[in-house]
A protein has these predicted regions:
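A short Gly-Trp-Pro
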Residues: 1-124
Length: 124
């Protein structure tokens, strides 16, 4: 079984996740843009039971981060964990987005990803 590890910038918070993600996506919503400081967030969703972390985390608006360096890492939900893929220790070059959400807010210079589902808002 594949194990992926990740951490914040300062290393105070680390995590590991086992297996393959349920789905991989890009989000262009205003909240993701503001919390990341970028035009979109590249993320993947795993079952909650496949995820574990160490170190103290802080959470704001459902998004967990390191209180020391501010690194945004994951969103813990009841059944799933959404991980920001830029926080992985090894680049996730084998993971490609299955879908894009909040494309009504996507920058006009960004083109739809071929083969990825396109959703004006959240995917249901």
């Amino acid at each position: 079984m594949r194990i992926r590890t990740g951490s914040c910038l300062c290393g105070a918070v680390a995590y590991r996740v086992e297996g393959e993600p349920l789905r991989v996506g890009l989000c262009h919503c205003a909240d993701c843009r503001k919390s990341s400081g970028s035009a979109f967030v590249f993320f993947a969703v795993w079952p909650r039971r496949a995820f574990s972390h160490s170190g103290e985390i802080a959470t704001f608006a459902g998004r967990s981060f390191c209180p020391a360096c501010g690194g945004r890492l994951f969103c813990l939900q009841q059944e799933t964990t959404e991980i920001r893929l830029g926080s992985l220790d090894d680049p996730p070059s084998d993971l490609a987005p299955d879908y894009e959400v909040w494309i009504k807010r996507r920058e006009p210079w960004l083109h739809p990803l071929p083969g990825a589902g396109q959703y004006a808002e959240d995917a249901d």
